[in-house]
Amino acid sequence: MKLRRSDRMVVISNYLINNPYKLTSLNTFAEKYESAKSSISEDIVIIKRAFEEIEIGHIQTVTGAGGGVIFTPSISSQDAKEMVEDLRTKLSESDRILPGGYIYLSDLLSTPAILKNIGRIIAKSFMDQKIDAVMTVATKGVPLANAVANVLNVSFVIVRRDLKITEGSTVSVNYVSGSSGDRIEKMFLSKRSLKAGSRVLIVDDFLKGGGTVNGMISLLREFDSELAGVAVFADNAQEEREKQFDYKSLLKVTNIDVKNQAIDVEVGNIFDEDK
């Protein structure tokens, strides 16, 4: 398919954005668009400059016989902070308080545009880490983990609290649940879900006592895999927990006043490295 340079640059840009973290040979573009490799190389230089100027992401050129280009998506710090501030405002709405002091998050974590932006923000925060998979526990964390995995272009695995025959052989661990740590529960992961030696990013919607995350970390050990990091949408800072793992949060809930129907929410520690 022979294209004019302007058209060719559009389709190459679209390809890179939709195939992040994937090494693509320049020959692939040259053959597909019937252009000289030198012309494709010039296209990449222009696209790279534009992407970096508007902070869409970075293009890395890999030299050698097996070389090519790799696109790493990003988001500007200003855009990310504005998005998180908007989420903070939404989460502070008093009508989100549910019986028992829980917070309604489903509308936020089921909106594609919001999920896409959260995925970009979390992925950027871990862009220097080698990540092979994203892990979460069913069910509320699934859309969030999927969004992050899409940006990182890696698989995501779902840990379940109940055994399903469709999962095949599974590995299970016991974990402490409940804010007071007074319940022992079990979680399961299919043996086919995760390869040994994988570096895994754990993603969850809401961090309370930390028992669920600790359970997933225990599962990683059973699979001879390594924890690459923990990211949560919101952290309940009211909960007392023994710090057994580091994590990054977009939002931090500092107070839930059920009686007066008030929620105090701050921006989490996701941007601490920018300070």
Swiss-Prot record:
It comes from the Bacteria. GO terms for biological process: negative regulation of DNA-templated transcription; negative regulation of purine nucleobase metabolic process. Residues 74-275 are annotated as: Effector binding domain. Signal peptide: none annotated. Pfam families: Pribosyltran (PF00156), PuR_N (PF09182). Transmembrane segments: none annotated. The keyword DNA-binding applies. Keywords: DNA-binding, Transcription, Transcription regulation. Residues 1-73 are annotated as: DNA binding domain. GO terms for molecular function: DNA binding. PANTHER family: HYPOXANTHINE/GUANINE PHOSPHORIBOSYLTRANSFERASE, PUR OPERON REPRESSOR. Homodimer. Belongs to the purine/pyrimidine phosphoribosyltransferase family. PurR subfamily. Contains an N-terminal DNA-binding winged helix-turn-helix domain and a C-terminal regulatory domain (or effector binding domain) resembling phosphoribosyltransferase (PRT) domain. However, the PRT domain lacks enzymatic activity and serves a purely regulatory role by binding effector molecules. This is Probable purine biosynthesis transcriptional regulator PurR. It comes from Streptococcus pneumoniae serotype 4 (strain ATCC BAA-334 / TIGR4). The lineage of its organism: Bacteria, Bacillati, Bacillota, Bacilli, Lactobacillales. The gene is purR.
